[in-house]
Amino acid sequence: MTIEFSNFTFKYWALEKPTLKNINLTIGKGEKVVIVGPSGSGKSTLGQCLNGLIPFAVKGDCSGSLKINGKDTKSLDLHQCTNIVGTVLQDTDGQFVGLSVGEDIAFALENQMVIQEDMHTIVKDTAKMVELDDILDVSPFDLSGGQKQRVSLAGVMVDDVDILLFDEPLASLDPKTGKAAIDIIDHLHRDTGKTVIIIEHRLEDVLHRPVDRIIMMEQGEIVANMTPDQLIASDLLEQHGIREPLYISALKAAGCQITEDDKPAYFSTLNLDKFKPQIENWYHQSFVACTPENSERLLTVNNLSYSYDGIKNTLDDVSFHINKGEFVSILGKNGSGKSTITRLIMGVLEPDTGSIFMNGQDLAQSSIFERSQKIGIVLQNPNHMISHHMIFDEIASGLRNRGINEATVERKVFDILELCGLKKYRHWPIDALSYGQKKRVTIATILVLEPELLILDEPTAGQDYHHYTLMMEFVRELNRKLGITILIISHDMHLVLEYTQRAIVIANSQLLADAPVNTIFSQPALLEKANLTVTSLYSLAHAMGIERIDNFIHCFIEHEAKNK
């Protein structure tokens, strides 16, 4: 089923300028296409035009044409569009309508008044395709992130749609679960011949399996329409703020000139032999031993255990420490207990057993308010933290709650606005800011209180590479210049690799490892236990025959830090 955009332009009624500008794009029947681009580039708007949300549910002005199999979508209604294009959303919870997996998959069939006997057969067959046939009676809300996504996928597949649209399917998934999701999408594409369109930031993870083309968007326009090899060999990813595969970054760091003929889009097809001398030379010239860490303790966690239901431990006898001035990550798959550690540190939860000390004092003796004087936390979604209309008032709120006089409040807020690059926005309403700017406001709101420890929960969620790099470089400067200790909670292995010195790995409720990042990332068996995966940096070093892969990873980390 062919998709044809011809001189297609779309403008939301609420905006002055078009979000999509003069789009000309053809996607053939059975193609597998990836759409990439920075936040605000128009990727999701393009997807909403395909599935009929625009213009039937989301209003705006359209010009040009969009035809699916020769039919102009203006002649269709929303119901007809959804019978052609099945959409799997980033937030799968918002897509569930059934009390069980089976009911959710059957929802579309019930609307079509399919007889019950046929319905059972179709549901079972569809569930088997996405490996859910053994949990049809389970509530979808009790499943893991990867399982939830498969339920959503099955729910659109029973309609027997011709086009499958995935809107950021990897956004909330840990690396191993993300790879499994890409495997299933690839399996469906090969077995059914359906047209597959994937909108995603995490390009290297999507390229875990082959795709036909990559469409790159910027400011509402298509700036590239290429094969994966053509795009990866170009400099367009870097120019437009899209993270390129790690092994490509490492090859470029070593001065390697990559061409389309090298088949660079997939590590398995890349011609590595020609690059081996340059890689080895770069590695031997670049290696510098790690500097010893500051040994003065800030936070000590001793034998911490916690259970939400009193039966199964979410955390089981976990111990670790964080030194003053460190930049540390807690790494683990979804549901491993990472966020529970944060809640215990902040005092929102009380441990069943164990203790937490800060600067030698037992935090069990401190209230949540007293802990907040020393520890600041920035939540994944800035909208969950913001409580005031104006930027100045939001940042000043914590100081005012402490009874600080207004002259001091004003001085401190102005200082922090300057530090965070927000001074020119001080009189702006928060609603006028971008997502990344809101994130800076939440960090500023915490920093003005002068915490000793700053905790960032999934700081890169919902942000493209360009915007999250800006934010993380700012956080790195806070760590270097002000000496603020930083703790990141994440399953984003690229983030952990680029910015943190040490990783604490949690798996199956227990502490699995506590070591420098380059050591953690050079141990495949350990990563497998944590439901994580080796990075392509490891694969590159291994393919090159480098014995000390941890040192190779350390070289790359140092190179990236110097060139940010």
From Swiss-Prot:
A cellular component annotation (GO) from this entry: ATP-binding cassette (ABC) transporter complex
Binding site for ATP 1: 37-44
Enzymatic class: translocase
ABC transporter domain mapped to chain residues: 3-244, 299-533
EC number assigned by the record: 7.-.-.-
Domain of life the protein comes from: Bacteria
Membrane topology: Peripheral membrane protein
Gene Ontology MF: a single term: ATP binding
Gene3D superfamilies referenced in this protein's UniProt entry, alphabetically: P-loop containing nucleotide triphosphate hydrolases
UniProt keyword list: ATP-binding, Cell inner membrane, Cell membrane, Membrane, Nucleotide-binding, Repeat, Translocase, Transport
NCBIfam families, A to Z: PRK13648.1
Protein family according to the UniProt entry: Belongs to the ABC transporter superfamily.
Protein name (database record): Putative ABC transporter ATP-binding protein PBPRA2240
Organism: Photobacterium profundum (strain SS9)
